[in-house]
């Protein structure tokens, strides 16, 4: 179980869990930015949901086991969790912490890599503790940052 997401309006805190996506979930992501059905053959896809309410997807993550670390292919907030009018905060942090936890569980020391949009590189450095791998868009979460994320988001 992950620690929580926070309702931005009321301040209420909700326990969450990360579950594998099931086929009926794909029908619910038609208005999302990414084409999640196309990712299923290549990645493990998981959903973040409020405990006891698995039918409302708060966010999704697609990860791939690269045998030395996990690669985060996609991550996305639900449309209602984007922008200034978003309902819940904490969705992406929960999902990245989940990927880090899986990396620890596989013996990869928490390492997770991903390609970042250049406009978000600084944001990921601040919020996730991610680092750039060279000058390009490839970033990674190392053991130290992964430990902080897992400790923050997992009970």
Positions of predicted regions on the chain:
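Short beta-strand-alpha-helix junction that forms the catalytic/metal-binding core
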Residues: 91
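Non-catalytic substrate-recognition and accessory regions of acyl/acetyltransferase enzymes
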Residues: 1-86, 94, 101-111, 115, ...
